């Protein structure tokens, strides 16, 4: 099983629409670990996803649409070396 790590920036109407909580649920359902947080610009959500490549891809596919009420305008994915550093999936404070 190939493991993967993606550093993701999702832009658009993605704050105030339960994006972080929804992403956490989707990630946990797919066995993906990492974190998600809002950025202080008010229009960006940032996440790091780690897990089996197929599972990470499922979360990324979901993130292109997001939860009801979201309007994703752009998604930037930076593939990084898998580190296996997370035990679960967390919602972190805004930066």
Swiss-Prot record:
Q: If you read the UniProt record, what top EC class would you report for this enzyme, in one word?
A: hydrolase
Active site per database record: 20, 38
Query: Which InterPro entries does the UniProt entry name for this protein?
Result: Acylphosphatase, Acylphosphatase-like_dom, Acylphosphatase-like_dom_sf, Acylphosphatase_CS
- Statement: the UniProt record of this protein carries the keyword Hydrolase: yes
One GO MF term: acylphosphatase activity
Record-annotated Acylphosphatase-like domain positions = 5-93
What reaction does this catalyse? an acyl phosphate + H2O = a carboxylate + phosphate + H(+)
Alphabetical list of Pfam families matching this protein? Acylphosphatase
Q: Where is the signal peptide?
A: none
E.C. code = 3.6.1.7
Q: Which UniProt keywords apply?
A: Hydrolase
Member of which family? Belongs to the acylphosphatase family.
**Protein name (record):** Acylphosphatase
What is the scientific name of the source organism?
Answer: Pyrobaculum aerophilum (strain ATCC 51768 / DSM 7523 / JCM 9630 / CIP 104966 / NBRC 100827 / IM2)
Gene behind this protein: acyP
């Amino acid at each position: 099983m190939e493991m993967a790590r993606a550093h993701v920036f999702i832009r658009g109407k993605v704050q105030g629409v339960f994006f972080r909580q929804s992403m956490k649920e989707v990630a946990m359902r797919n066995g993906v670990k990492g974190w998600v947080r809002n950025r202080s610009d008010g229009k960006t959500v940032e996440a790091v996803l780690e897990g089996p490549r197929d599972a990470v891809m499922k979360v990324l596919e979901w993130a292109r649409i997001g939860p009801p009420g979201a309007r994703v305008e752009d998604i930037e994915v930076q593939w990084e070396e898998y580190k296996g550093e997370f035990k679960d999936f967390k919602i972190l404070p805004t930066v």
